[in-house]
């Protein structure tokens, strides 16, 4: 087998692959062995039909498709290695109609390859470090959040619903006079202002009391996942069975100790929260500075991000989002239902971020190559020890879980490249 690579405009090129007749015949033999196992012929055990009889009955061309499914992927994999290219998407294969047994076989693959960024300025970039300040109002807000998490719900007697209350409701939705699937619920605890229902639903329940009913009229979003409801007006017949309000605990020294066993008073709690918030803001400021440097270096580089790489990154982002939803007791299907969005909508929202991620990654790889930045054995060993301590595992177990150290090595190289940008930047306070 031989391969010839011709680079074209952008990140696309054509790989011409020549397969000798001997390899064609070998693929035909494999195809026959596969196909004959599925054929029952009187007088022969299953899979034992002679090749000559098979060809007389079905024709040798009946093996071509199976042979192509063997020879094309195998030859393509060898060809990209021989050509030294790195595809980033599935190839477009052409020329398979030229396949004939006993003859040399030539086909082409149009391939999108990994771009080679033309780097712009990445040293001496000017960035301003964000100031770090923690106000009393921020400390108060955090304490209020902690109090809210400890709040208890108490039933409101003969009082109207206000934002923040939880209404226990029965509801049924109608489009026109017809109820629709999924539009009915009983004893549903709905926190008013949570935004968990269709836009406009929760606001219409403010002012309603327990025991009262109300028709809530909403319009489903145009992009709602259920096509039969998208853009349509619906009426929900809602009965409020119970109204509950949050009652916050009293903030005193005893409760401060309950919130944090390491403090003895409210003042100590406030001081600790202020210190932790300051540390968090310092970390956020440092991260923002790094992000800005990386973004500037990426913007200064010239190259086109292939659509296949954007799609692959969008797939990863969608998978990550689904995993985060699962930790909250949800999944993507439920998210689409409650948000009124489809997978296509969500992918569209992620596309710009996905392209930015790929662009940044390729830029950093190019800078690392230009500056000869590598992850040393000592770097990898130190990171393995750190991870082993963090997850209470051995270094060997960590390596096994990662499937080797290649991913870790690349992560370290990228981190060192970002640090290189920081060390060579012009930073103002």
Curated annotation (Swiss-Prot):
BP GO annotations: 'de novo' cotranslational protein folding; cell division; chaperone-mediated protein folding; protein transport; protein unfolding
Gene Ontology annotations for the cellular component aspect, listed alphabetically: cytoplasm
Record-linked Gene3D superfamilies: 3.10.50.40, Trigger factor ribosome-binding domain, Trigger factor, C-terminal domain
Pfam name, any one: Trigger_C
EC number: 5.2.1.8
Role played: Involved in protein export. Acts as a chaperone by maintaining the newly synthesized protein in an open conformation. Functions as a peptidyl-prolyl cis-trans isomerase.
Family: Belongs to the FKBP-type PPIase family. Tig subfamily.
Protein name: Trigger factor
Organism this protein belongs to: Lysinibacillus sphaericus (strain C3-41)
């Amino acid at each position: 087998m031989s391969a010839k690579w011709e680079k074209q405009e952008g990140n696309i090129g054509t790989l011409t692959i020549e397969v000798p007749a001997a390899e064609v015949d070998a693929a035909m033999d494999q195809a026959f062995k596969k196909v004959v196992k599925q054929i029952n012929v009187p007088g022969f055990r299953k899979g034992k039909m002679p090749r000559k009889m098979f060809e007389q009955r079905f024709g040798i061309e009946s093996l071509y498709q199976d042979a192509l499914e063997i020879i094309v992927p195998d030859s393509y994999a060898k060809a990209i290695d021989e050509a030294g290219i790195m595809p980033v998407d599935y190839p477009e294969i052409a020329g398979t109609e030229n396949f004939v047994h006993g003859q040399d076989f030539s086909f082409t693959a149009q391939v999108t390859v990994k771009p080679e960024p033309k780097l712009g300025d990445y040293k001496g970039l000017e960035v301003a470090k964000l100031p770090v300040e923690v106000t009393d109002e921020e400390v108060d807000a955090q304490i209020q959040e902690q109090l809210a998490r400890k709040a208890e719900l108490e039933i409101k007697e003969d009082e109207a619903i206000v934002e923040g209350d939880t209404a226990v409701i029965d509801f049924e939705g109608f489009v026109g006079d017809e109820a629709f699937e999924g539009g009915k619920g009983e004893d549903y605890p709905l926190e008013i202002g949570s935004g968990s229902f269709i836009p406009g639903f929760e606001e219409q329940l403010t002012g309603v009391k327990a025991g009262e009913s109300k028709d809530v009229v909403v319009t489903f979003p145009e992009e709602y996942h259920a096509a039969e409801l998208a853009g349509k007006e619906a009426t929900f017949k809602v009965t409020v069975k119970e109204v509950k309000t949050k009652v916050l605990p009293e903030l005193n020294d005893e409760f401060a100790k309950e919130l944090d066993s390491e403090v003895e008073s409210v003042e100590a709690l406030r001081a600790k929260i202020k210190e932790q918030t300051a540390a968090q803001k310092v970390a956020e400021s440092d991260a923002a500075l790094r992000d800005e440097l990386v973004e500037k270096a990426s913007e200064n580089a010239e190259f086109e991000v292939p659509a296949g790489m954007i799609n692959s990154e969008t797939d990863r982002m969608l998978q990550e989002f689904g995993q985060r939803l699962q930790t909250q007791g949800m999944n993507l299907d439920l998210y689409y239902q409650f948000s009124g969005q489809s997978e296509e909508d969500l992918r569209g929202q992620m596309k710009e971020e996905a392209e930015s991620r790929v662009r940044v990654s390729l830029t950093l790889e190019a800078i690392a190559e230009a500056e000869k930045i590598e992850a040393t054995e000592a770097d990898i060993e130190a990171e393995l020890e750190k991870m082993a301590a963090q997850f209470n595992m051995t270094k060997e177990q960590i390596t096994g879980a990662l499937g080797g150290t290649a991913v870790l090595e690349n992560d370290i190289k990228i981190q060192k490249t970002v640090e290189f940008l920081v060390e060579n930047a012009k930073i103002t306070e």
